[in-house]
């Protein structure tokens, strides 16, 4: 499994553990924290004290019927015979403390302290804040609707005001749903099925010892809407295809894309193949540069080249890692002719030489090209025109001294270095994700420790009360054991 998914699952598991731990602690806070045997004993003691308090309030306390007083008198008599008068004082002190605790319980019952954090934890506080916000929004909406009805009644009369109020209520109920539906529809209509295709046709191919030239005509459409029709030469200058900002940190990127458009749209690409395959006898060239979104809404770029019945296709999928895809040109319309097979081998070797650069260029260019052509189709009067001019595209034999060759070499080296950087980054990815995992675990541990400390601080009063009760119960049980031992 990929380290990305491992860390994602670990983070989700840590959040789930934190959430369920918090819920368990909140549930335990609402329960009695004492064990069952101590809880039963405490309930009995509270029952006796409550009964004693009620009898004292109604004035029906009888010394003969009071089990507590009778037991205290018996213990006092036994200890008096043994000469232990201090026990009587301790018993009286315990009675005084019980009466004081009863008074405190009565005061707390009269003025209960309501704290949402002590009662239900952070969920209670959040619930109260949410209820207060709902009340404020409901109040604001009611006042706004009343002002709207008053304004409509003042300007249009009672009947039209009734219709306007009904419309406002319907709009308030369904406006958000309609807005979301329209937004999703707009995104789907603008993002699904978009295609931009630029096809070129080269005729009168003429090759000399120093240059290769041809008459080239280009036609570009977006969803069957024409955005350019004219000679290949000067296409990049006539179409505002500045798909990147010409900033200092992106200057090399802008240069690469600019030369890439010139290379593929102005006919340099087939001329380079013809220059490096001079033994092929070709008189006509067809080609296409296409960018489209497939049925799964994934951007795909495609280069097509056709030499006298032989077609070569290169496809690139955007937003994918170059090292995870197999880059190669595919050949179609294969014949069994020996001469044709030899020519095909020569062309394939020439195309394979820079296939990686063409692939990465399509990955980078197609998403930007699709977004850029949206503006071209909106302004039809300015850019949807037929351009006339010189159709002749000439390219010298590509030697290291040629400017185009220098650009293309720099472009290929940059893309090759970019691919190497991605490969090196992939080898270091595991170390980065391991560091992220350690930081995630440490942050989760700190969060759990903080939660425990916060809950401990919030429960300090209950814990101290439980400890005092346990200590008092242990002290009374030791006194009873001493009495039984004396008896």
Swiss-Prot record:
GO terms for biological process: symbiont-mediated perturbation of host apoptosis. One of its GO terms (cellular component) is host cell peroxisome. The record marks 193-194 as: Cleavage site. Glycans are attached at residues 206, 210, 219, 223, 242, 246, 275, 281, 294, 297, 306, 333, 337, 343, 379, 384, 391. Residues 83-107 have a biased composition (Acidic residues). The gene is UL37. InterPro entries: Herpes_UL37_HHV-5-rel. The chain crosses the membrane at residues 433-459. Residues 83-121 are annotated as: Disordered. Keywords: Glycoprotein, Host endoplasmic reticulum, Host Golgi apparatus, Host membrane, Host mitochondrion, Host-virus interaction, Membrane, Modulation of host cell apoptosis by virus, Signal, Transmembrane, Transmembrane helix. Residues 1-22 form the signal peptide. Pfam families: Herpes_UL37_2. This is UL37 immediate early glycoprotein. Belongs to the immediate early glycoprotein family.
